[in-house]
Amino acid sequence: MALTREEREQFLTEPHVAALAVTATEQDRSPLTVPIWYQYRPGGDVWIMTGLNSRKGKAIAAAGRFCLMVDRVSPTVRYVSVEGPVVSTVPATREQLVEMSSRYLPAEKVDGYVDFAWKEHGEQVVIHMRPQHWLSSDLDEV
């Protein structure tokens, strides 16, 4: 059963690790699909953080759009997939790294991870995607 707009947006606000899919830059390859942290607030854009020169960063820049899919298996099987165009790519800030890390890590791990990532991951960008196409389902009724 498809989710309502409110249900799918609420599910996307939860801290699931997403599967990001984007057209590969190599012509003879399937889409690049990788796990990624993301941030979303209902009615807004989805944003991700990645390396400026990472494979996914380059692929997203070339394609101009990408897809995220999040799912769960309990208490019911549910997924939400959202796809759309990139609306901005900007240099990442330490504050954004803290926000994203706080979403996924236990509070006592955030500072250490942020210090490590800020020093070791190289130049990062924040990519904003405007949700344009949604797919969703929950198998609660099955």
Map each language-model feature to its residues.
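Short beta-strand segments
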Residues: P15-L52, I60, F66-V70, Y79-V82
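Short, surface-exposed beta-strand-loop junctions and turns on beta-sheet-rich folds
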Residues: S54-K56, P75
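Short secondary-structure boundary/capping segments
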Residues: E9-Q10, Y38, K58, A117-K119
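Extreme N-terminal tail/first-helix region
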Residues: M1-H16, T76
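A short, aromatic/hydrophobic, helix- or strand-capping loop or linear motif
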Residues: V22-A24, D71-P75, E108-F116
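Generic structural signal for secondary-structure transition and capping sites
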Residues: H16-V17, R65, K109, W134
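Charged, gly/pro-rich active-site loop segments
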Residues: A2-L3, Y79-V142
